[in-house]
């Protein structure tokens, strides 16, 4: 009798395995069923990307949606962390801001290119005189960040932008920088960031308290262009890629990933191949340009107390040397 039950159990296990292979395909880059059902916008590839080992979950939908953001937060643990790594004490701010947005889609409905090749364009001074504009424009997806301009720098950084990450203190306020084909992504570091977006979308007076510098007082983007980044992406960057401690000593300011590292993490979740440009800093010369635009020098980055630039540079060096990404501005 016992042998009979064991045979039934083993048969059931084998049947489950066979069905699993049929449904998901052992050679297809796996995506969680809930994500595939939710947003079938990331085309699966027949091979894993070079950086697959860095991620616990794959093809995670990076933008929050009004209809199910609480469910997704509970599923991936974002309800257990505060901003910028979760929404434990800010869920109502998220709900209100999301209710004013028109879409949480990843790509255009007509975009069916599988296995996307992406470039993440940093704002580093290393881009000066590199004439990478045409090369950058050739990628399927181009991710930029903050107020790194395209206008006037097309030869160096290209013309196209698929996604642009921003926060209230770093967003463009001059309409000449608005490309209607660009999707802009709010990276919320604090509840004030969500309140700021809500006030702009509702046409209310902007409360500028609680920001490290004066935020934009007008929004040059239309609601259809705006998305809110899932804090899970920022948490992945901090804890799994940069290995930041979850609790910093009392005598230290907590460190958070830069927008650049967050942008790379986003690319890992939506792209099959990731290239980088503009992520190299020249710390040996503090008078060298910090950005490919403007007059800021490296001395500003050296004084930054909110980011661990050393940890980020070591991470970038590691993924480049292991060929997990390709660096277009490698000297």
From Swiss-Prot:
Entry EC number(s): 2.4.3.6
Q: Could you give a single Gene Ontology term from the biological process aspect?
A: cellular response to interleukin-6
List the glycosylation sites: 129, 181, 282, 295, 308, 327
Q: What is this protein called?
A: Type 2 lactosamine alpha-2,3-sialyltransferase
According to its UniProt entry, the function of this protein is described as: Transfers the sialyl residue from CMP-N-acetyl-beta-neuraminate to the terminal galactose residue on sugar chains of glycoproteins and glycolipids. It's alpha-2,3-sialyltransferase activity is specific toward type II glycan chains (Galbeta1-4GlcNAc) on glycoproteins and glycolipids such as neolactosides nLc4Cer and nLc6Cer, whose sialyl-products serve as precursors for the Lewis X antigen. Critically involved in the synthesis of functional selectin ligands needed for neutrophil recruitment during inflammation and lymphocyte homing to the lymph nodes.
What sections of the sequence does the record tag as coiled-coil? Answer: none
> Under the cellular component aspect of Gene Ontology, which terms does the record hold?
Golgi membrane
Q: Which residues cross the membrane?
A: 5-25
